């Protein structure tokens, strides 16, 4: 079995070579963001979320921490923090799983099959059990308000042009030549 750091590198490489957009924060690969599209044929179809992923030192023996950066209305996602209540990730994680499993299986399954009996968002769980039509409407409202593809994807493009200090790296003011050139 590969060492945890080698496995982390291999899993990150697989994820980056997949169809997911991955934005790394620094070179240690312990925290990064993944652009995640809502599953087809779900209430979340058409929505786009930025998912924050943190890998513990002991990854893959310990599960990654996964959270939604932009808001999502779901019984198993904390509305304020974006933390995900996902048994497979939080309790039954196995080193046999990898990051691709998180984005191709675990998160889509969570969105397709919410579990109102184990909620992080009690209001969403209650509404799902009480009035499914109202719940579905609220999910769609959140998707339209917080998960617009053009806003999330343009935020990613903006991030690419930002330097580490948060200033726009395309700013050419510092390069401007003052005065006249010698003839």
UniProtKB/Swiss-Prot annotation:
The active site is at residue 85. InterPro entries: UBQ-conjugat_E2_core, UBQ-conjugating_AS, UBQ-conjugating_enzyme/RWD. Gene3D superfamilies: Ubiquitin Conjugating Enzyme. Residues 152-176 have a biased composition (Acidic residues). GO terms for molecular function: ATP binding; ubiquitin conjugating enzyme activity; ubiquitin-protein transferase activity. Residues 1-148 form the UBC core domain. It catalyses: S-ubiquitinyl-[E1 ubiquitin-activating enzyme]-L-cysteine + [E2 ubiquitin-conjugating enzyme]-L-cysteine = [E1 ubiquitin-activating enzyme]-L-cysteine + S-ubiquitinyl-[E2 ubiquitin-conjugating enzyme]-L-cysteine. GO terms for biological process: protein ubiquitination; ubiquitin-dependent protein catabolic process. Its EC number is 2.3.2.23. Residues 148-183 are annotated as: Disordered. The keyword Nucleotide-binding applies. Pathway: Protein modification; protein ubiquitination. It holds the Pfam family UQ_con. Keywords: ATP-binding, Nucleotide-binding, Transferase, Ubl conjugation pathway. Expressed in roots, petals, sepals and silique walls. Coiled coil: none annotated. Transmembrane segments: none annotated. Induction: By senescence, but not by heat shock. Accepts the ubiquitin from the E1 complex and catalyzes its covalent attachment to other proteins. Belongs to the ubiquitin-conjugating enzyme family. This is Ubiquitin-conjugating enzyme E2 6.
